[in-house]
A protein has these predicted regions:
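Local sequence-structure signature of Cys/Sec-based thiol-disulfide redox active-site neighborhoods
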Residues: 3-36
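Chalcogenol-based redox active-site neighborhoods
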Residues: 28, 60-61, 92
Length: 98
């Protein structure tokens, strides 16, 4: 979990995608997140976290539905939503925190 603290402690916004390999909604978010990362460039980061490989972290953050997306800035969670999201909405949200 100390690695998680390092992961989210950036001044640029960090979009975390908690996903499952077998979850269809998670799979459909892959191209969306690729578009978000491309649009952000160095103004933000997109990080995918597999809940099956990170069960302790998933439990600590109470991840119940997939995908679950979170935006962190400066070590603080500033936004959280479960379910599929649109790339334009995510880009606009992240730009609000740049």
């Amino acid at each position: 979990m100390s690695k998680f603290g390092e992961l989210i402690n950036f001044e640029v916004p960090i979009l975390l995608d908690f996903f499952g390999d077998l979850d269809e909604s998670s799979k459909s978010m892959h191209p969306v997140l690729r578009d978000v990362a491309a649009a952000l460039g160095d103004r933000g980061k997109v990080i995918k976290i597999n809940v099956d490989l990170n069960s302790e972290l998933s439990e600590a953050l109470r991840i119940k539905d997939l995908p679950t997306l979170m935006i962190y800035k400066g070590g603080e969670m500033v936004w959280r939503q479960s379910g599929e999201q649109d790339a334009k909405i995510l880009i606009n949200l992240i730009n609000d925190f740049v």
